Regions:
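…primarily DNA-binding HTH/wHTH and HhH modules…
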Residues: 106-128
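Residues within helix-turn-helix
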Residues: 41, 52, 88-91, 101-102, ...
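Flexible loop/N-cap segments at domain edges
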Residues: 11, 18-22
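Short hydrophobic/aromatic patch on the recognition helix
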Residues: 54, 58, 103-104, 108
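Terminal helix-turn-helix DNA-binding modules in bacterial transcription factors
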Residues: 24-28, 32, 37, 60-99, ...
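An amphipathic alpha-helical interaction segment
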Residues: 1-14, 53-55
Length: 128
Protein backbone atom coordinates (compact mmCIF):
# COMPACT_ATOMS: atom_id res chain seq x y z
CA UNK A 1 0.00 0.00 0.00
CA UNK A 2 2.78 2.45 0.92
CA UNK A 3 4.58 1.60 -2.31
CA UNK A 4 1.38 2.35 -4.23
CA UNK A 5 1.11 5.77 -2.53
CA UNK A 6 4.74 6.59 -3.37
CA UNK A 7 4.23 5.57 -6.99
CA UNK A 8 1.15 7.79 -7.23
CA UNK A 9 3.00 10.72 -5.66
CA UNK A 10 5.91 10.20 -8.05
CA UNK A 11 3.44 10.28 -10.93
CA UNK A 12 2.01 13.59 -9.71
CA UNK A 13 5.53 14.99 -9.34
CA UNK A 14 6.33 13.94 -12.90
CA UNK A 15 3.11 15.57 -14.12
CA UNK A 16 3.95 18.79 -12.24
CA UNK A 17 7.43 18.85 -13.78
CA UNK A 18 5.96 18.32 -17.24
CA UNK A 19 3.46 21.14 -16.72
CA UNK A 20 6.19 23.47 -15.48
CA UNK A 21 8.30 22.57 -18.50
CA UNK A 22 5.42 23.35 -20.87
CA UNK A 23 4.77 26.67 -19.11
CA UNK A 24 8.47 27.59 -19.41
CA UNK A 25 8.32 26.83 -23.14
CA UNK A 26 5.26 29.05 -23.48
CA UNK A 27 6.95 31.87 -21.55
CA UNK A 28 10.01 31.66 -23.81
CA UNK A 29 7.79 31.70 -26.88
CA UNK A 30 5.94 34.76 -25.58
CA UNK A 31 9.14 36.66 -24.84
CA UNK A 32 10.62 35.77 -28.23
CA UNK A 33 7.48 36.81 -30.12
CA UNK A 34 6.12 39.87 -28.26
CA UNK A 35 5.66 41.74 -31.53
CA UNK A 36 3.38 39.04 -32.94
CA UNK A 37 -0.16 37.84 -32.30
CA UNK A 38 -0.04 35.78 -29.11
CA UNK A 39 -3.48 34.22 -29.07
CA UNK A 40 -4.25 31.07 -27.10
CA UNK A 41 -4.37 29.21 -30.40
CA UNK A 42 -0.90 30.38 -31.39
CA UNK A 43 0.59 29.56 -27.99
CA UNK A 44 -1.09 26.16 -27.81
CA UNK A 45 0.20 25.38 -31.29
CA UNK A 46 3.74 26.28 -30.25
CA UNK A 47 3.72 23.40 -27.73
CA UNK A 48 1.36 21.09 -29.69
CA UNK A 49 -1.35 21.04 -27.02
CA UNK A 50 -4.98 22.15 -26.84
CA UNK A 51 -5.88 25.75 -26.04
CA UNK A 52 -7.92 24.80 -22.99
CA UNK A 53 -5.19 22.58 -21.56
CA UNK A 54 -2.51 25.24 -22.11
CA UNK A 55 -4.66 27.89 -20.42
CA UNK A 56 -5.39 25.59 -17.50
CA UNK A 57 -1.81 24.54 -16.79
CA UNK A 58 -0.50 28.09 -17.28
CA UNK A 59 -2.94 29.32 -14.64
CA UNK A 60 -2.15 26.36 -12.34
CA UNK A 61 1.61 26.87 -12.53
CA UNK A 62 1.84 30.69 -12.58
CA UNK A 63 -1.34 31.81 -10.85
CA UNK A 64 -2.12 34.26 -13.69
CA UNK A 65 -3.83 33.96 -17.05
CA UNK A 66 -1.93 33.90 -20.32
CA UNK A 67 -3.35 37.28 -21.47
CA UNK A 68 -2.28 38.88 -18.17
CA UNK A 69 1.22 37.43 -18.53
CA UNK A 70 1.49 38.60 -22.15
CA UNK A 71 0.35 42.12 -21.23
CA UNK A 72 2.84 42.24 -18.37
CA UNK A 73 5.72 41.13 -20.62
CA UNK A 74 4.74 43.67 -23.25
CA UNK A 75 4.57 46.49 -20.70
CA UNK A 76 7.95 45.55 -19.21
CA UNK A 77 9.50 45.52 -22.69
CA UNK A 78 7.83 48.85 -23.52
CA UNK A 79 9.37 50.33 -20.37
CA UNK A 80 12.81 49.11 -21.50
CA UNK A 81 12.35 50.65 -24.95
CA UNK A 82 11.17 53.95 -23.49
CA UNK A 83 14.09 54.06 -21.09
CA UNK A 84 16.94 52.89 -23.33
CA UNK A 85 15.94 53.60 -26.95
CA UNK A 86 15.13 56.63 -29.02
CA UNK A 87 12.13 54.93 -30.63
CA UNK A 88 9.02 57.06 -30.87
CA UNK A 89 6.19 55.95 -28.60
CA UNK A 90 4.24 54.69 -31.62
CA UNK A 91 7.27 52.62 -32.69
CA UNK A 92 7.52 51.20 -29.15
CA UNK A 93 3.84 50.25 -29.34
CA UNK A 94 4.44 48.35 -32.58
CA UNK A 95 7.58 46.67 -31.23
CA UNK A 96 5.66 45.20 -28.32
CA UNK A 97 2.70 44.00 -30.35
CA UNK A 98 0.18 46.86 -30.24
CA UNK A 99 -1.07 48.08 -33.60
CA UNK A 100 -3.54 50.44 -31.92
CA UNK A 101 -1.60 53.31 -30.36
CA UNK A 102 -4.51 54.49 -28.19
CA UNK A 103 -4.99 51.02 -26.74
CA UNK A 104 -1.24 50.78 -26.06
CA UNK A 105 -1.25 54.13 -24.26
CA UNK A 106 -4.27 53.20 -22.15
CA UNK A 107 -2.78 49.81 -21.26
CA UNK A 108 0.57 51.41 -20.42
CA UNK A 109 -1.12 54.02 -18.22
CA UNK A 110 -3.13 51.32 -16.44
CA UNK A 111 0.06 49.30 -15.87
CA UNK A 112 2.42 52.10 -14.78
CA UNK A 113 0.16 54.94 -13.65
CA UNK A 114 1.49 57.32 -16.30
CA UNK A 115 1.49 57.77 -20.07
CA UNK A 116 4.41 56.46 -22.14
CA UNK A 117 5.72 60.01 -22.66
CA UNK A 118 5.47 60.81 -18.95
CA UNK A 119 7.32 57.59 -18.17
CA UNK A 120 10.09 58.41 -20.64
CA UNK A 121 10.46 61.91 -19.21
CA UNK A 122 10.68 60.56 -15.65
CA UNK A 123 13.27 57.91 -16.37
CA UNK A 124 15.43 60.15 -18.54
CA UNK A 125 15.45 62.82 -15.79
CA UNK A 126 16.66 60.20 -13.30
CA UNK A 127 19.45 59.15 -15.68
CA UNK A 128 20.53 62.71 -16.41
Amino acid sequence: FIRYIFEKLAGFQHQDNRQESVVEQIKHYINDHLKEDLSRKTLAGSVYLSEDYVSKIFMNVTGISIPSYVASCRMQKAQEYLKYSTFSVSKVALEVGYSNFSYFSKTFRDYTGCTPNEYRNRVTKKQG
